[in-house]
From Swiss-Prot:
It holds the Pfam family GCV_T_C. The keyword Transferase applies. It is an enzyme of class 2 (transferase). GO terms for molecular function: aminomethyltransferase activity; transaminase activity. This is Aminomethyltransferase. Its EC number is 2.1.2.10. Keywords: Aminotransferase, Transferase. Gene3D superfamilies: Aminomethyltransferase beta-barrel domains, Aminomethyltransferase fragment, Probable tRNA modification gtpase trme, domain 1. The glycine cleavage system catalyzes the degradation of glycine. Coiled coil: none annotated.
Length: 363
């Protein structure tokens, strides 16, 4: 493995715990600690912990911060509060998704954008390029933050025991600042990437290991990127670089809820997204279940039963929960019909599949 890979503050901790390390977006990250299936099931049925400190954090501050983030992002940021985060997209002029991200309003003139690890530099440069007309400061503060995700049906009860705040009623994308956890001051966000209840914890980078080790004392399973991928795929959650790209719009990528082109404010890509909202996008993302043995991998062709190509697989795996072979695919809009049978070209075979809902959590 290349010695040029970036490491999170927990790298040596993974190694000491016997994790299998892989390259991901320029980082050395654990793909698994025990087994992907064991870690997956821990999150689906109990509780698991992920290090996501490789994610990027970009801070926007200044007098025009609120107008600037709205100009950059496809969702309506005007109603953000200092306790409610928002999932949104950073789009180009054609409506293509440069990145999908979560924005936190930390104060009236202070916003934190949490972006995908592989896109941090690209996003930062894009934001810098568009800030000229706004009175704002933009900083890449990724090296100041550690980020952990504690996920699973038992996560809320555990966090409630450990923090000095009541998190019982916290809803999706609500967050609290200034929360004390193992002596560290953190941002606690009710969010995740698994389809389960849970929290994402933002801390000072120097506190990351203390919090990680502290949580693992409570019968919490450490989990790697392998389980993170199978969990998000079962939940029908897209991955940027596969299911979302700069040539895929929110309406094509299945995140239409993150696009609000009818608001008064202007934003980059608005005209294209307004047209797609009103008239439909040329393609759409669907869930697939293979009806024959095989795994649908990224880039595999999707065909109708006559062998005509109508799209391609963007992500696929075998579901540890159901044992089924599941996928997300991008197909022509007019070819969509729930339950319809299709073919997927898996190596030299054409395997039958059917269109199903994207969220395929089965437990």
């Amino acid at each position: 493995m290349s010695s040029d890979l970036k490491q999170t503050p927990l790298y040596q901790n993974y190694v000491d715990r016997g994790a299998k390390i892989v390259e991901f977006g320029g980082w050395a990250m654990p793909v698994q600690f025990s087994s992907i299936k064991e870690e997956h099931n821990a999150v689906r049925y109990e509780i698991g912990l992920f290090d996501v400190s490789h994610m990027g954090e970009i801070e926007v501050t200044g007098k025009d911060a609120s107008q600037f983030v709205q100009y950059l992002l496809s969702n309506d940021t005007d109603n953000l509060t200092t306790s409610k985060a928002l999932y949104t997209a950073l789009c180009n002029e054609e409506g293509g998704i440069i990145d999908d991200l979560v924005i936190y309003k930390l104060a009236d003139d202070n916003y934190l954008l949490v972006v995908n690890a592989a896109n941090t530099e690209k996003d930062f440069n894009w934001i810098l390029k568009h800030k000229e007309k706004f009175d704002v400061e933009v900083q890449n503060v990724s090296n100041q933050y550690g980020q952990l995700a504690i996920q699973g049906p038992k996560a809320r009860d555990l966090i409630n025991q450990l923090v000095d705040e009541d998190v019982t009623e916290m809803k999706m994308f609500e967050f609290k600042q200034g929360v004390k956890l193992f002596g560290a001051i953190v941002i606690l966000s009710q969010s995740g990437y698994t389809g389960e209840d849970g929290f994402e914890i933002y801390c000072n980078i120097d506190d990351t290991e203390k919090i990680w080790d502290g949580l693992l004392e409570y019968n919490v399973m450490p989990c790697g990127l392998g389980a993170r991928d199978t969990l998000r795929l079962e939940a029908g959650l897209p991955l940027h670089g596969q299911d979302l790209t700069e040539s895929i719009t929110p309406y094509e990528g299945g995140i239409a809820f993150a696009s609000k082109p009818l608001i008064d404010a202007d934003f980059i890509g608005k005209s294209v997204l307004k047209d797609q909202k009103e008239n439909g996008a040329p393609r759409r993302t669907v869930g697939l279940e293979l009806l024959e043995k095989g795994i649908a991998r990224t880039g595999y062709e999707v065909m109708d039963l006559d062998g005509n190509i109508i799209g391609e697989v963007t992500s696929g795996t075998q579901s540890p929960s159901s044992g089924k072979s599941i996928a997300l695919a991008m197909i022509k809009r007019d070819e969509f019909e729930m339950g319809r049978e299709l073919l997927v070209q898996v190596r030299k075979r054409q395997l039958k599949a059917k269109i199903v809902k994207k969220n395929q959590i089965d437990k």
